[in-house]
Amino acid sequence: MGMHSQDNAIAPLGISVSSALVIVGGYALAMVIFAIWARRDLGRGDESYYLAGRSLTGPILLVTMAATNFSAFTVYGSSGASYRIGLSFLPIMAFGTGFMAVSMYILGRKIRSRSVQHGAMTAPEMVMGQTGSRSAQLTMASVLVLATIPYLALQPRAAGIVFSALFGGPDWIGAVLVTLLVVAYTLTGGLKAVVRTDAVQGAIALGLLWLGLAMVVNDAGGISAAMDAISSSENTEGLLGREGNYTLLIWVSTMILWLFADPMFPQLYQRLCAAESDAAIGRMATLYPTVAWLAFLPPILIGTIGHLSYPDLDRAGSDNILPTMIMDVGGEWLGGLVLVAGLAALMSTMDSQLLATGSLVTRDLLDKESPGDRSRESVIISLSLLGPVSYTHLT
């Protein structure tokens, strides 16, 4: 999941530059502090750098799995989709995402066990350990890297869109600045830094989304009044059903796809390898569906309720509905904070993809005789250039 391209850019929302600077500056400073903290107990080996010494307990594993999987789409894209489609988008996203916990639990324990057995840190390494086939390892690593690179390149583009909304400048400046920040703390502390910043980013995004929902619902006269107003109009009553949107076949096929595909995302697979124990994976899987509902409920409700205030938005405008609604009821500071919530969501995805893809290149595709630290750093820096460079081809 990722933010839409520039065709759906967030329009500048009237936030003063001074407010935006304070909000974004404070957030960036917090990320740097957490990276420095992680650096203090970082070992020199790949297991410490890529897997945090296989030390992730249940609560932190839950937080980092959720923060990694929920990108800027959770904040902006899902609210825009619910504006266009309605509440039927909620079970697709919340239940479908939560249902992945089944495969995370069943596969996750096996993944962790085989990872420890073979000293593997990536899926291709595990295949090599099981089969002894270097060709299979190279093939799988190549496929995973090629599949992840487009998604990795989109995150800086999404960051550029957010920065443009905050400051009104060109998108590429935001893309470069966010890329530099993410690379800085990822290089500094490896997975430990990424996990700790995930915790902060996840808390920021979730807290601000629920605060925004409470204010929007209160402004609409309560949830019952808002739903009654939507259902009483011929133009909006379809937003409360699924007719014409999600048939049983579409719904089931989507659930099956996510169930099997998502645990193979390199960044999620990496975290399963980094779990402290099977019990940690079990606790994570038990609570993951709850977190999925908590993450998707606010933006989807806000997007649907947005029809009451803005009934005729086009696709680009609908992707802007969440910060617009929250700014209407909370002013520029809260609107700016919600944009930072989206920034936090995309950064928690970007840093994880960067680190996981870097591990695939370093551990599976490159010569393992290369100097460890230098190889890791050069790979991550090279991968990070994909987002900014994509502007030259896609804008």
Feature annotation, model-predicted:
Residues Y49-A67, R114-A147, E276-A279, R283-V291, ...:
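Transmembrane-helix boundary/entry motifs in multi-pass membrane transporters
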Residues P91-T186, T254-A261, L343-D351:
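Helix-loop-helix module between adjacent transmembrane segments
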Residues I15-R39, A52, A81-E125, A205, ...:
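Extracellular loop-to-transmembrane helix junctions
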Residues H4-Y76, T186-G189, G202, L208-L211, ...:
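Membrane-interface "cap" regions at the ends of multi-pass membrane proteins
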Residues F34, A38-L42, G108, T148, ...:
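Hydrophobic alpha-helical segments and their helix-loop junctions in multi-pass secondary transporters
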Residues G119-P124, M128, G189-V200, M264-L294, ...:
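Hydrophobic, small-residue-rich membrane helices and short re-entrant helix-turn-helix hairpins
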Residues G2-V17, G53-L56, G77-A94, M128, ...:
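Loop-to-helix junctions at membrane interfaces in multi-pass transport proteins
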Residues T392-T395:
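Conserved small/polar residues in nucleotide/adenosyl-binding loops
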